[in-house]
């Protein structure tokens, strides 16, 4: 149950929303598109995550498996949303 609560709070903090929004990320954040299907979720992550080894590992695995050439235009992370939220939750605390 605690895991479910932490996933929901992480999604709230990360600003998870549907891709249809055109809102620019806040200063110091970047938008990433997460999901394995055509309907990806847009999340805002702090730019500082790019320096974190755990986040870099996620990006490397995605690059190896899928590459970074995606039609979404932004940084696309084709992994399960729950996995992404779990990893970014670890980076928060």
UniProtKB/Swiss-Prot annotation:
Pfam families: Auxin_inducible (PF02519). Higher expression in thermo-responsive cultivars (e.g. cv. Alst-1, cv. Ang-0 and cv. Com-0) than in low thermo-responsive cultivars (e.g. cv. Dja-1, cv. El-0 and cv. Kon). Its main location: membrane. GO terms for cellular component: plasma membrane. Keywords: Auxin signaling pathway, Cell membrane, Developmental protein, Growth regulation, Membrane. InterPro entries: SAUR_fam (IPR003676). Disruption phenotype: Reduced rosette weight and area at 22 degrees Celsius but not at 28 degrees Celsius. The keyword Iron does not apply. It is found in: Cell membrane. Induction: PIF4-dependent regulation by temperature. In low thermo-responsive cultivars (e.g. Col-0), higher expression at 28 degrees Celsius than at 22 degrees Celsius in petioles but not in leaf blades. In high thermo-responsive cultivars (e.g. cv. Alst-1 and cv. Ang-0) higher expression at 28 degrees Celsius than at 22 degrees Celsius in both petioles and leaf blades. Induced by light. It is a peripheral membrane protein. GO terms for biological process: auxin-activated signaling pathway; response to light intensity; response to temperature stimulus. Exhibits a high natural sequence polymorphism between cultivars, thus conferring thermo-adaptation to environmental conditions. Interacts with PP2C-D1. Provide a mechanistic link between auxin and plasma membrane H(+)-ATPases (PM H(+)-ATPases, e.g. AHA1 and AHA2), and triggers PM H(+)-ATPases activity by promoting phosphorylation of their C-terminal autoinhibitory domain as a result of PP2C-D subfamily of type 2C phosphatases inhibition, thus leading to the acidification of the apoplast and the facilitation of solutes and water uptake to drive cell expansion. Functions as a positive effectors of cell expansion through modulation of auxin transport. Involved in thermo-responsiveness of plant architecture. Enhances plasma membrane H(+)-ATPase. Belongs to the ARG7 family. PANTHER family: SAUR-LIKE AUXIN-RESPONSIVE PROTEIN FAMILY-RELATED. This is Auxin-responsive protein SAUR26. It comes from Arabidopsis thaliana.
